[in-house]
Amino acid sequence: GRTKIVWVETPANPTCAVTDLAATAAVAHAAGARVVADSTLSTPVLCRPIEHGADLVMHSATKQLNGHADVLAGALVTARRDELWERVTHDRGYRGAVLGPFEAWLLLRGMRTLFLRVPRSSASAQRIAEWLTTHPAVSEVLYPGLPSHPGHAVAERQMSGGFGMMLSFRVEGGGDAAKRVAAGLRLFKNATSLGGVESLVEHRAPVEGPGTGVPDDLLRLSVGIEVVEDLLADLEQALPCGSDASRGGSHETDA
């Protein structure tokens, strides 16, 4: 067939859409195509796509693998050391896409705590997602750990130990209201990256650009390793409450 690669990202950024890896692999392999899975948001701690039929797995090691926001790196994993692996490593060497020794050391340092950081941030993200579903200023919460998420059953099958550190939610009142919430957060820092020890927030629509389908009222959270009660308190003081929620007003607190 004409299709050579089927590319999936699961969970997807920033919508948290979940792709059934096993079903995708069955269809792709029947057509003679390979499956490449971007598993950045899961890390190998929560999901190992090769075990579900993927041929290659990609990670932005800049994100949670490193976890300290001080490295630019990536990883490509093959199912076995075969002809495909040889082609990938040959191309990597000739194009010079080789990580520097200091960056490699930083990445190894960060990965020593991976199995501590990922479960903590995932558990905190789950609590935050559940809390946001009850808030009057939030119209929708996107997180595969919620039973209401359309991909929850698939995520349960192919993920273990949690559903990841990233979630998104939509704010009542539109894009301006979402911007006010992001600006009002104190512990969550406004930044584009994700997967570090610090919790981040981003108004995502301007980053994604027009035509991508990302709504203007969507905020993306990357949950770090802070005390989750502090993160919940930060969200509570930034989100409008009561009648203010429908008007997109601010939630003012005493200084």
Model-found features: residue ranges?
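Anionic group-transfer/hydrolysis microenvironments
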Residues: P11, T40, A61, R170, ...
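PLP-dependent enzyme catalytic core of the Aspartate aminotransferase-like
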Residues: R117, A183, S199-A255
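N-proximal accessory regions
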Residues: E103-Q126, W131, G162-F163, R170-G173, ...
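Conserved PLP-enzyme active-site core in the AAT-like
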Residues: G1-A137, L142
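Residue-level signal for secondary-structure boundary sites
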Residues: D82, G175-A177, E229-L231
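Conserved C-terminal alpha-helix-loop-beta "cap" of PLP-dependent enzymes
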Residues: A137-L219, V223
